[in-house]
């Protein structure tokens, strides 16, 4: 018995011995047990499916006894790589047991035959292996198996495990005794292989019989309980295995089950591929070019003969040497790859460039000392010999002797500019020069030539070449037509440029002539006799229209065809890019899916992130061609460059038919100029080889600045002329002559003799700077034709000299020319070899016609690269006029040295980021730390910028809530960008101090002062102020700038008031204006308040300063008049870290100076502990604030003064009444103003230098004389009082200069305001002032970055709902004028605004000063008036400048009728011309929308409540709805009474409704512009900082709408604490 039969026998014996025990075990099982595929289980889980369940018919104790066996089975199966599925069990006996035994015998009998056949095929190798199928073998490359093939690797691991288990099973089999197997039963090994072996599939015919027997022996219940195993990865199916493991003798079987191979793979012979098949497959896949010579006819188009350019005399260059075999291979490959034969030339050879390698090296090789140096390579040193350049001009001994003569004819001189030119002479010279250009262009008529050429080319394209000619193919015809089309495009471009030049030149001539005429009319005299006449030539309009339309249609069709071709090309590129993008996206998805699968298979492992790749952007399809757009472009271009059919042809004619105004009719300055011209004379010196040989006579300078000499100089010479020079000298009166310029004359050719020499003109210029005190414009000095000095010109002295130079002719008719020496001939012949241009003579380069003639006679090859520069120079010079581009290239070889293409550079994200930063785009201005690589730059960097470009015309209402204000903000942004772009170039200038930071070098005066100071007596009690050092913006960074706020003292702080006290005051309406504003102390003497016990603290105020969310506060003082004298320091951070001047000027941050009252509350609950402990809580109550914009501090450098505190009209728990004893001294100083005040000193450390305003000249429609008068008026005022503000002209919103009085005109206020107090003019004026103050304030320094100050008209101001002090003041002044008041616009300086605008009115015999931004008014002698000095007053018809000694409003007289006090602009010498106003005739107001205001009110209230809750993240915020409702009903009363006389009633109402609460709150009133200022104002009050546990809040918002969408916003914020 062989070993294979022994294995089968052992398995059969073990199976029979355990048969009885297995029957008993089946009775204890359920009717069916679920089968499951065998898989690896975790060692801690015991699979319940493997354990026998309790039988319904058996003893319940039996499964307990068999538990060790069951656990052994479970543990054994757990350790293996697979688990056997349990066989279905049944509870039936008798026939069921017999049928089960029969089925098992049949199965074992069938399995034994299969196992024997499988074992016969087993190869006795030490390790079972599996051969891959040929289909899988093809997937393997020479670099290894493909990464996606997981099946093969899994099979190898399974084979490795099977090998180890087979070895263990063999060793176990040798130890165990081999029981005898009854005949007819399989052995143990056969039984094991039957259940665990993977059999290879057999032919279908041999498999059908076992399957049939298997079906016959299986009942219906067993078929339902069986499950199919999923197909294995090796390709075959694993058979189901039945669990037959019960009984004591199953240990053998279990021991073998754990370590036996689960498959045996059949081994087949390896696949073999014959060499013949492999060669055949390579022939099909690869192309091997032939080495045979290709006939010439195959390399040329059909019916085309080869053309040899070298035989035709054209230069072709030397081709590089290539082996003939390689050429044949390449030719065969190209013919197969490209059948169109584009790689072959006309001669049938492959196109090749000339060999670029030089025949000899440019430098000798560097040899080491060990290497031998050949004699040919040794360096030969020769001493340098100085070359005598003048030897070619010296007559040598070998030359024939004789006298030679050169004739120089100087006919005259004309100045194209002279210092004595008047402005009219400048225009006349320009007009004459333009007219000469016109005549020259008209004579050439290049536009007509190009038009004819364009028509001929179009005819050639339409006709086409004759296709019947045998020597022309379709490719050649198409190539020729493409060349024609390209030439048509170029010719059309040149034609349009020429026509535009002609039209522009004609327009310029007419413009200069009009300027000349207007100048003559302005100056009322004439200096030049020039006269221009425009002659109209009528043409056939119908024919012109037809030709015009035909040309446009032809151009449209050509452009349409070009765009169609371009669109097809772009579409092809788009398809290619789209395919690439789709392929890339597919690869990315596959990678993503693979990473996801790897993460699911290995959830605990960290998967390395792949290297970031550049994302491909999905390409966009090109836009199709639009005929309408092309037609519009063609018609616009034609309208610019061509004459329209209905326009006549204008022919200018310039003549000297005019008359010059005599001296007696000219002003004194012009007479002085003419007399100065008469004093001047001119003469010329003639220099030969830098030696003076003669000079002309001195001729006086004519009135037309022409000088006629008419002299011929005969120079007897013996040497060749090296140089001929004329020096122009000018003499003024009896002074010494002055050299103006030198004129270098060309040396004539030997063929130029006297009598045939043409007269030529040579230009000259001078660099002298001459300034004159008369009407002469000077030389090298800027001057202007404008009255305001704009558009300045700087002209230098220049002119032309008419002359001719020729060789003289002797008596015998022989020219007296020095002959060329032999040495000179040799020298020129040597030059001819090196340079072709040098061999044609010295003057050959100056005469291009001679140069072209010489090139034609010498028959130069135009295709020779050595002659390319010369041929290009000749073609440009002989074409009449070349096309001069509008640019020049700094680096002509830039494209050759580019590292990447322009397209790739534009795709670079880093380059784009750098480019946007250099352009100062707002999103990237001052952007720092740009990454080095593109992959490190995220796409989201450009999201904001691209979104802004996309949403350029989209109105975003998210930040503004109100749609109208969103539109206004968008419009202001566009105006801001327009202004910034306009002044961007003008701002690019720097002072020396901006670029160089250095200490000033002390001079003798500074040193002297320092020495004197050392000797001065020191006075410590009176220190002197030292000037602070100023710094510039580029030296700053975060943390360098500090904001210093010095809190000095405060006056009349509201004091605490018991809740029970009430005051009876008359109502506001019952008090007259005279009572309110009388200056008597009795009106303001308060009654003594007896509610406070003696010695009780009235108020404990402290000041808190917040800036950029940084908060500092002072110590707590006591009393209503506290004194702190403390300095607070706050850091300043510029937006985006940009400390440039423009960035600092546009900062919108505000400094909030809040005054709080510190209140101590006793919170000790048990009075028994009051003697032993103190428990108090500090609360702070907001009393008022002062707001200071940072822009004001930045421009003023320091703010010093006393400011009124903005105290809410209702301050619960506090009273504004003062104590008689404490306030008696202070009341005597008070006049008209009420309120609380605080003294501050604010500055920036270090001191910053604000940018200087750019004084640019703007367009203006004002009269020129008026603008000149304004400049003169401002200059006179600034000369006497340089620090006072004088304003005569302003810039409107369109960028034009407007006289300032045009802005003042009576304009009607809203009728709704006039109806409130119909009989009280003063109350109406206050209401109108309050309406103006409700319009939001927006300084121009913030809007336009300090560039300029734009003035808008009143209707524009009301539409924009934003403006600075000037717009508010103009609107208020216009309202007052309409009310019949005497009102002026007052320009001066105020605190804290700086230069500002107020309104001055005359009321009941006294002057009142109105602040338009706050709506308050002050008396002239009010010490608390914020206006500190007065510069000028502006009325509707005049301007008055303050020329008084004092400038404070307290000390000046406002009577403008006194000329000694006020300097008026319009006077007797300059009467008022009756200027029209730029304001509209009347203002149209839209009715207020109360529904929109109510909706806006609810949204703002919701936003503020959310903000307060966000500001209290650690505390719960409770809202008292009852109190909120009470406050909401109270706010309309505040708006109606303007916040006056309602405090007591409101306090009583709150005490009545909320008596058990301690209430602290206040209303805030602001004009509405946007939400952010409202949020900042609420935040600055600190109402959210209360951390009492049982605190409740109330917030109410009320918006009252006024006409023109002006909104008044009231915000009532309160905190409530329940009394214990």
Curated annotation (Swiss-Prot):
Outcome of mutating residue 117 to R: In JBTS9; uncertain significance
Coiled coil: 439-493, 532-582
Biased composition (Basic residues): 29-41
Tissue: Strongly expressed in prostate, pancreas, kidney, lung, liver, retina, kidney, fetal brain and fetal kidney. Lower expression in spleen, small intestine, colon, skeletal muscle, ovary, thymus and heart.
InterPro entries, A to Z: C2_dom, C2_domain_sf, CC2D2AN-C2, CEP76_C, CEPT76/DRC7_peptidase-like_dom, DUF5523, Tectonic-like_complex_comp
PROSITE patterns: C2 (PS50004)
Origin: domain of life: Eukaryota
Pfam families: CC2D2AN-C2, CEP76_C, CEPT76_peptidase, DUF5523
Biased composition (Basic and acidic residues): 1-12, 103-115, 147-156
Chain intervals with Acidic residues compositional bias: 220-230
A GO CC term assigned to this protein in UniProt: MKS complex
Stretches the record annotates as Disordered: 1-241, 592-628, 1062-1087
Localization (cell): Cytoplasm; Cytoplasm, Cytoskeleton, Cilium basal body
GO biological process: axoneme assembly; camera-type eye development; cilium assembly; determination of left/right symmetry; embryonic brain development; heart development; kidney development; motile cilium assembly
Effect of substituting residue 1330 to Q: In JBTS9; uncertain significance
PANTHER family xrefs: CENTROSOMAL PROTEIN-RELATED (PTHR20837), COILED-COIL AND C2 DOMAIN-CONTAINING PROTEIN 2A (PTHR20837:SF7)
Self-association state and partner proteins as the record states: Part of the tectonic-like complex (also named B9 complex).
Disease: Meckel syndrome 6: A disorder characterized by a combination of renal cysts and variably associated features including developmental anomalies of the central nervous system (typically encephalocele), hepatic ductal dysplasia and cysts, and polydactyly. Joubert syndrome 9: A disorder presenting with cerebellar ataxia, oculomotor apraxia, hypotonia, neonatal breathing abnormalities and psychomotor delay. Neuroradiologically, it is characterized by cerebellar vermian hypoplasia/aplasia, thickened and reoriented superior cerebellar peduncles, and an abnormally large interpeduncular fossa, giving the appearance of a molar tooth on transaxial slices (molar tooth sign). Additional variable features include retinal dystrophy and renal disease.
Protein name, entry field: Coiled-coil and C2 domain-containing protein 2A
Origin species: Homo sapiens (Human)
Gene designation per UniProt: CC2D2A
